[in-house]
Curated annotation (Swiss-Prot):
SUPFAM superfamilies: Homeodomain-like (SSF46689). Binds DNA with a high specificity as a heterodimer of A1 and ALPHA2. Keywords: DNA-binding, Homeobox, Nucleus, Transcription, Transcription regulation. GO terms for biological process: regulation of mating-type specific transcription, DNA-templated. Was initially thought to be alternatively spliced. This gene is functional with 1, 2 or no introns, but the functional protein is produced only when both introns are spliced from the mRNA. It comes from Saccharomyces cerevisiae (Baker's yeast). One of its GO terms (molecular function) is transcription corepressor activity. CDD domains: homeodomain (cd00086). Mating type proteins are sequence specific DNA-binding proteins that act as master switches in yeast differentiation by controlling gene expression in a cell type-specific fashion. Transcriptional corepressor that, in a/alpha diploid cells, binds cooperatively with the ALPHA2 protein to a 21-bp DNA sequence termed the haploid-specific gene (hsg) operator, to repress transcription of haploid-specific genes and of MATALPHA1. This is Mating-type protein A1.
């Protein structure tokens, strides 16, 4: 049983060492640990104990990563950019991707922000 505890401790260390990595990499490492456990000479009870330990730690990692990501703040568009967008909208209510990029450069915002602004403006205009 001491071997299982030390193995679980090593697994814990491994899982917490990969906190800075992407979720896909955490899943890959966790799956590798699961495969290693399944191929080992451990009893079913020991395997189950280790699986449970890994699952609990992976949940903690997910929650930790989720907490670290700050919510996206609402980006504001300057009054000058808004006025320019209004002018463009009066001329044309829908833009293709090249036009969105050009407008975005002139406004100092991203093409995605232009796209969302136009979608919202069309919805408000109905």
């Amino acid at each position: 049983m001491d071997d299982i505890c030390s193995m679980a401790e090593n697994i814990n260390r491994t899982l917490f060492n990969i906190l800075g990595t992407e979720i896909d990499e955490i899943n890959l490492n966790t799956n590798n640990l699961y495969n290693f456990i399944m191929e080992s000479n451990l009893t079913k009870v020991e395997q189950h104990t280790l699986h449970k330990n890994i699952s609990n730690n992976r949940l903690e990692i997910y929650h930790h990563i989720k907490k670290e990501k700050s919510p996206k703040g609402k980006s504001s568009i300057s009054p000058q950019a808004r006025a320019f967008l209004e002018q463009v909208f009066r001329r044309k209510q829908s833009l293709n991707s090249k036009e969105k990029e050009e407008v975005a450069k002139k406004c100092g915002i991203t093409p995605l922000q232009v796209r969302v602004w136009f979608i919202n403006k069309r919805m408000r205009s109905k």
